[in-house]
Amino acid sequence: MLIEFFNGFVKVTGWPAQKLIFRTKIYYEDKQAQGRHIRGGAMVVSNHTSVFDYAAYLFVFFTRTLRVQMAEVLFQKQPLGTFLKMMGGIYVNRDTHDFSFMRESEELLNKGKVVGVFPESRIPKPGEETPLPFKPSAACIALAARKPVIPVVTDGNYFGKGRAHVLIGKPIDPRDYADPERPEKENIQALTDAMRERIIELERLLDERVNAKA
């Protein structure tokens, strides 16, 4: 409850500033299938362009509290680490074999919460092909919780003279990839591949939508 309250406070007080910083234009693959309001438990998966992706999505999905998986390095910086804990950030230690973040994410989904994941696990470096290969943990969690996966892409155009652009895609049902005749590892890989392919498709669609308005 405290996490929801703190998120609400941050979003209400930060609304004027984000209008200047992000000026986000939101597009939809199919608004009837999935709009900005997320009903029930769901996982939001996105490409990763900047440390500000999380901040932008707080306001894109204004009506829900995003419990986002975050790298250990962010929690090591103060006072940022304390702030992220208060916002409900899910601690992910990429340097160890601690998978407690997966259990925590699944539990949150089963409680009807919204979990945010950047499956690339880091921001791509200049010159790298994007999106980077997806880590399998997101698919593993989605298959276990059997909650919809909402693919979202951003162009990361923050702080510029233009505006940020975000496209919300149609949900992916992980149950479509839970084939009892296949080994679990193959199901996880199939969903991982499907999520990455959808992000690539949505990046192309977002580029088309933005350029059509130019």
State the predicted function of each range.
Residues 1-31, 78-87:
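A transmembrane-helix-recognition feature enriched in membrane-embedded lipid enzymes
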Residues 2-5, 102-214:
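Non-catalytic C-terminal accessory region of glycerolipid acyltransferases
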Residues 17-23, 44-46, 91-95, 126-129:
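Short, flexible loop segments at the rims of nucleotide/cofactor-binding pockets, characterized by
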Residues 25-27, 96-100:
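Glycine-rich, highly charged phosphate/nucleotide-binding loops
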Residues 30-37, 106-107:
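Short amphipathic alpha-helix with an adjacent loop that forms part of the alpha/beta core around
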Residues 31-33, 73-75, 96, 156-158, ...:
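Residue-level detector of flexible, active-site-proximal loop/helix-junction positions
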Residues 36-96:
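Catalytic core of membrane glycerolipid acyltransferases/transacylases, capturing the structured
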